[in-house]
Amino acid sequence: MPVVVVASSKGGAGKSTTAVVLGTELAHKGVPVTMLDCDPNRSLTIWANAGEVPENITALSDVTESSIVKTIKQHDVDGAVVIVDLEGVASRMVSRAISQADLVLIPMRPKALDATIGAQSLQLIAEEEEAIDRKIAHAVVFTMVSPAIRSHEYTGIKASLIENGVEIIEPPLVERTAYSALFQFGGNLHSMKSKQGNMAAAIENAEAFAMAIFKKLTEALR
């Protein structure tokens, strides 16, 4: 079954938040998920250790450059989704993970700098496609987007990406206190006992975000 790689050459773009929200929402829908923490910051591991890991999720840390392909293949089984949270630099590990991907997500905040550095991830995907002689489905996911106002910077970056043929996941992952609280309390949004901001809106956005990615993943596997 599918392998989703979350990659960005820029730290702070929302990689781990994207991975955790996607993984927990898919698991909540009954999809078995294996999450691989390949980021030296160990954000995914911090989330896993903060509370009880939700049902249907296996979280693995200490995945190395030499073990990443083997680990992905070990957990790429029928009916399961593997989500790989990569380090925020271009590296051999990143290249090896991308080569195994059915879908690569490139998170970026709606900022010009994020878009510029995000272009490096798009270039890396193109290079891997050439190396392995197959297309790799990929899409940009906007993170930390204001829930109230879409800035001119955001709409401009989005329009430019679309003009250049880059697919974008809709809806974006909006800025919600509940998403950052996942790394404090662990678990998922549905089990969070300490309510953080507008939980209903956070859950609605997270569900729509995850289902849009799952739809894109299904299309990529056809």
Swiss-Prot record:
Disulfide bonding pattern of the chain: none
Name used for this protein in its record: Protein ParA
InterPro entries for this protein: DNA_Partitioning_ATPase (IPR050678), P-loop_NTPase (IPR027417), VirC1 (IPR009744)
Keyword vocabulary terms for this entry: Plasmid
PANTHER family listed in its UniProt record: COBQ_COBB_MIND_PARA NUCLEOTIDE BINDING DOMAIN-CONTAINING PROTEIN, P-LOOP CONTAINING NUCLEOSIDE TRIPHOSPHATE HYDROLASE
Species whose genome carries this gene: Rhizobium radiobacter
Keyword Phosphoprotein: no
Superkingdom in the source lineage: Bacteria
Gene3D superfamilies documented for this protein: P-loop containing nucleotide triphosphate hydrolases
Presence of the UniProt keyword Protein biosynthesis in the record: no
